[in-house]
């Protein structure tokens, strides 16, 4: 079984081309493949197939809004095997993979996701490095809530970017004090507010057009970056300063991306890196439940 490995600001993925939708992505198999000791290691899996093929195979009950049968669809799975609606870094890597392998020849096209079709612009793409802008669509305010991180309570805003986020801006945080926080344990949150779990971002306020952010992703743990999380963070940071539009550079442990918000919609621009390709041993894969 062929695979590629890539990352967007060190949020890393195993890419599995599966045009005929024959790969059984059971939760235990996904978890084993993403395990950094017994598998390839990754924050998630990106299955590459056309939306129509996934619908015909029963993976999708229906085509999400803005997605046609002929669109390439990012079937995304978290490291624990759970299905996720959307992954901004994943879309960049997915689009880069399509262009670098020749599966897609256009620089502008739509990537399907469970959160709807996501138009992308591939600014550059070769066998290893790419730069991609993703139209992340509508950003929705869910109201205020709070997270408990490292024994401290941080107030934040619930934000829907195709998946749920709780973005907490703290005016007293510096890059150094943010780095010192312990995100080993999952942050506490209100399960009544977020019944299906939530991705939690903690960040500094805007300074010279930029913020520093860390993220704990549901089903994964702390990651080096989270694309939808950077959009949520930029949204929360702008609102903290009384604005609802603007451009914010978001610095995460894995690098930097640029988020632009206007009219309630967001775009995300950042790098993608393809680092390896190879073949999974069939006996190992088939031996997994």
From Swiss-Prot:
Gene Ontology cellular component terms for the protein in this record: cytosol
Source taxon at top rank: Bacteria
Compartments, as annotated in UniProt: Cytoplasm
Residue(s) at site: Could be important to modulate the pK values of the two catalytic cysteine residues: 165, 217
Top-level taxonomy: Bacteria, Bacillati, Actinomycetota, Actinomycetes, Mycobacteriales
Role noted for this protein: Catalyzes the stereoinversion of LL-2,6-diaminopimelate (L,L-DAP) to meso-diaminopimelate (meso-DAP), a precursor of L-lysine and an essential component of the bacterial peptidoglycan.
PROSITE patterns in the record: DAP_EPIMERASE
Pathway: Amino-acid biosynthesis; L-lysine biosynthesis via DAP pathway; DL-2,6-diaminopimelate from LL-2,6-diaminopimelate: step 1/1
Catalyzed reaction equations: (2S,6S)-2,6-diaminopimelate = meso-2,6-diaminopimelate
Annotated HAMAP family: DAP_epimerase (MF_00197)
Protein name per the record: Diaminopimelate epimerase
Subunit structure: Homodimer.
Primary localization: cytoplasm
Gene Ontology biological process terms from the UniProt entry: lysine biosynthetic process via diaminopimelate
EC code(s) of this entry: 5.1.1.7
